A protein has these predicted regions:
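RNase H-like nuclease fold core
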Residues: 1-47, 58-59
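Short intrinsically disordered terminal tails
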Residues: 1, 135-136
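RNase H catalytic domain
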Residues: 8-17, 54-124, 128, 133-135
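Loop-to-helix element that buttresses phosphate recognition and phosphoryl-transfer chemistry
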Residues: 48-52
Length: 136
């Protein structure tokens, strides 16, 4: 079993209107961040949050991991998958469907962490997401 532990986060800049994502791989295998372009869902940071999780899982699969632990601070990324939250908007429906597809290829465990409470892995993912959305 080869397990990845990742922290994911999303960000939205009100001044630029850009959305970003950040993914921190705890093992140092390479962090990811970027801007999400052309989103018209109006969901702002949620787009970044869900993109971060999908990109983390896709990257873990590509890197040969068999399992991934996703540490997140936005509850929707887990609760839409478990059905605790109803997927009312297209963004959450698309996220749920994509994750169910990806979860056939890799074991996924979700762990909630509190935002901005001194967790260095989460803080690092937050900084990456802000870079992606153009926040300095």
């Amino acid at each position: 079993m080869k397990e990845a532990i990742v922290y994911t986060d999303g960000s939205y800049s009100g001044s630029t209107g850009k959305m970003g994502y950040g993914v921190h791989f705890e093992d140092g295998s390479g962090d990811l961040h970027g801007e999400i372009k052309n989103d018209s869902s109006g969901s702002r940071n949620v787009v970044g949050e869900t993109a971060a999780v999908i990109i983390a899982v896709q990257t873990a699969i590509a890197r040969g991991y068999t399992d991934i632990v996703i540490r997140y601070d936005y509850e929707g990324v887990e609760k839409w998958i478990t059905g605790e939250w109803t997927c009312r908007k297209p963004i959450s429906q698309q996220y749920r469907d994509k994750m169910h597809e990806l979860m056939k290829q890799i074991g996924v465990t979700f762990e909630h962490v509190k935002a901005h409470k001194g967790n260095e892995g989460n803080n690092h993912a937050d900084r990456l997401a802000k870079q992606g959305s153009g926040i300095k």
